[in-house]
């Protein structure tokens, strides 16, 4: 982006810091990661988890959820004011899985939130370390993005399920801050805005009074975040219109849906970060790795390196394929749910298959599932190459796309053609070009129609050998363009339910 000079890098957002140089950023991200690792080790000690149990991704997720719950101020306050039967607002917990006599057993644990906050602060040198909490939220969000489809949520807001590639970060909590906003897809922002406008249509007091003023500020801030994701002047001008509307209503919803569709070809800038489960950081800290001294980056080689030599396990249901479970977690670790499968396959060095062909359900185990038949296996999270994560949508280019997902949102800065079928996308634009945004709409449609096949994204960017940590000799992969590129193609994934 041209305005890069005024922007904080997303590592700075992640660590809440002001402008820093590269070394300082690496150190502060390292401090955040080290804090998560130390917290995890301490929790394993408290819960008396064996080494093997501490490497179980389901245990990691329970511990992560407990710390997020302990610091969820608004929900904690709500729980204290609206006591519900059988819920102690001061406690948090979840399932912990232990290996007993060659079988996996589930144990539901409860902990004082105060105690967890104390352990977290102690692991983070007495600081609140909100950046680490956000990092955990983004890992959970990336896992949801790879596991579930959001068809229902898309349809409910009047959008099209084929726009799923725009939905990154759709399950992130509101409190995820600037780092959270950076990883949200265009569709996610549009959906949040549409929900807000619909509330305003149904509730006449929504925009009024002192509360309404705060709502209005939030609305304009969300509009600005979305505007910042667009890379063309016409899309941004249209966002200004939506933001400045005196009384947002159906016209604004129409404009937002139009903009979301346009982002399938004129892609927005969406950040990607490799956020790993807490147990991976814990393992590294336990083996003596000093993240703050070594420095760490979420968008470079570091997460790949970490995954090359971490052994993480997962519970496996009777008819699940462990290799497929590994793919799911690998995609989540690298925020690659909406990446072109050909690019992911090349980097991973193993074929990455579409969601509909995976014989695996989500990573988390429901409380009513039978533990008797549960097995566990090692997750294969290693990669053949590494690539720099991107924060831009790249330029665009035509390619055959599918009935399910009709576009991708690149994760890795790797030179390639970006697949979408112009006819499919353009068919979505029949009709409405009147109203006060007509000239912008016309301009956006013109740009979409003239997107040329020879515009490849990320000119000259490639992947790197894992021994090439300074990214000196890029390998530009060649892709078989006849293969299917979309992950959610012909999909049968479960819906995401809170």
From Swiss-Prot:
Protein name: Nucleoprotein
A molecular-function term among this protein's GO annotations: structural molecule activity
Gene Ontology BP term (one): symbiont entry into host cell
InterPro entries (UniProt xref): Flu_NP
Modified how: Late in virus-infected cells, may be cleaved from a 56-kDa protein to a 53-kDa protein by a cellular caspase. This cleavage might be a marker for the onset of apoptosis in infected cells or have a specific function in virus host interaction.
Subcellular location: Virion; Host nucleus
SUPFAM superfamilies: flu NP-like
Subunit structure: Homomultimerizes to form the nucleocapsid. May bind host exportin-1/XPO1. Binds to viral genomic RNA. Protein-RNA contacts are mediated by a combination of electrostatic interactions between positively charged residues and the phosphate backbone and planar interactions between aromatic side chains and bases.
Organism taxonomic ancestry: Viruses, Riboviria, Orthornavirae, Negarnaviricota, Polyploviricotina
Family designation: Belongs to the influenza viruses nucleoprotein family.
Gene it is expressed from: NP
Organism in which the protein naturally occurs: Influenza A virus (strain A/Swine/29/1937 H1N1)
Motif mapping: Bipartite nuclear localization signal: 198-216
């Amino acid at each position: 982006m041209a305005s890069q000079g005024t922007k904080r890098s997303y590592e700075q957002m992640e660590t809440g810091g002001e402008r820093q140089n590269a070394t300082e950023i690496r150190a502060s991200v390292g401090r955040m990661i080290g804090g998560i690792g130390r917290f995890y080790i301490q929790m394993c000690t408290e819960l008396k988890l064996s080494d093997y149990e501490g490497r179980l991704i389901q245990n990691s997720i329970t511990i992560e959820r407990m710390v997020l719950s302990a610091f969820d101020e608004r929900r904690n306050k709500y729980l204290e004011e609206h006591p519900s039967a059988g819920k102690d607002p001061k406690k948090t917990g979840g399932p912990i899985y232990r290996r007993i006599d060659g079988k996996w057993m589930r144990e539901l644990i409860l902990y004082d939130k105060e105690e967890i906050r104390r352990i977290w602060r102690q692991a983070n040198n007495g600081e609140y370390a909100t950046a680490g909490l956000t990092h955990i939220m983004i890992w959970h969000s990336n896992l949801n993005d790879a596991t579930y489809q959001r068809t229902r949520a898309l349809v409910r807001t009047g959008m099209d399920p084929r726009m799923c590639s725009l939905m990154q970060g759709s399950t992130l909590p509101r409190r995820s801050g600037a780092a959270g906003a950076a990883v949200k897809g265009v569709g996610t922002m549009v959906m949040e805005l549409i929900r807000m406008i619909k509330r305003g249509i149904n509730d006449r007091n929504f925009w009024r009074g002192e509360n309404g003023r705060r709502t209005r500020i939030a609305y304009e801030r969300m509009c600005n975040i979305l505007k910042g994701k667009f890379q063309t002047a016409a899309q941004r001008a249209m966002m200004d219109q939506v933001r400045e509307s005196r009384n947002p209503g159906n016209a604004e919803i129409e404009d937002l849906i139009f903009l979301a569709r346009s982002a399938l070809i004129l892609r927005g800038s969406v950040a990607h970060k490799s956020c790993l489960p807490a147990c991976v950081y814990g393992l590294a800290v336990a083996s003596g790795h000093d993240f703050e001294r070594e420095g760490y980056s979420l968008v470079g080689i570091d997460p790949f390196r970490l995954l090359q030599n971490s052994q993480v396990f997962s519970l496996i249901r009777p008819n699940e394929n462990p290799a497929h479970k590994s793919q799911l977690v690998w995609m989540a670790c690298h925020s690659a749910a909406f990446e072109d499968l050909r690019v992911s396959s090349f980097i991973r060095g193993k074929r990455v298959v579409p969601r509909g062909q995976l014989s695996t359900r989500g990573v988390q185990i429901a409380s009513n599932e039978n533990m008797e038949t549960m097995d566990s296996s090692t997750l294969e999270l290693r990669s053949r190459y590494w690539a720099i994560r991107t924060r831009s949508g790249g330029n665009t280019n035509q390619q055959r796309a599918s009935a399910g997902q009709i576009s991708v949102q690149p994760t890795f800065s790797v030179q390639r053609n970006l697949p979408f079928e112009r006819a499919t996308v353009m068919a979505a634009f029949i009709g409405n070009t009147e109203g006060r945004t007509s000239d912008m709409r016309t301009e956006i449609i013109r740009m979409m129609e003239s997107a040329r096949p020879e515009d490849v994204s990320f000119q000259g960017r490639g992947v790197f050998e894992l021994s090439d940590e300074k990214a000196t000799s890029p390998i530009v992969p060649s892709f078989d363009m006849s293969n299917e590129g979309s992950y959610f193609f012909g999909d049968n994934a479960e819906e995401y339910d809170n």
